[in-house]
From Swiss-Prot:
It comes from the Eukaryota. Calcium is required for ligand binding. GO terms for molecular function: metal ion binding; toxin activity. This is Snaclec factor X-activator 1 light chain 1. One of its GO terms (cellular component) is extracellular region. It is found in: Secreted. Its main location: secreted. Expressed by the venom gland. Regulatory subunit of the blood coagulation factor X-activating enzyme. Activates coagulation factor X (F10) in a calcium-dependent manner by cleaving the Arg-Ile bond at position 234. Weakly hydrolyzes insulin B chain, fibrinogen and some components of the extracellular matrix in vitro, but does not activate prothrombin or plasminogen. It comes from Vipera ammodytes ammodytes (Western sand viper). Residues 11-13 form the C-type lectin domain. N-glycosylated.
């Protein structure tokens, strides 16, 4: 689920 303004900003891994 890529619901972030980018392609990593949402990733908290």
């Amino acid at each position: 689920d890529f619901d972030c303004p980018x392609d990593w900003v949402x990733y908290d891994q």
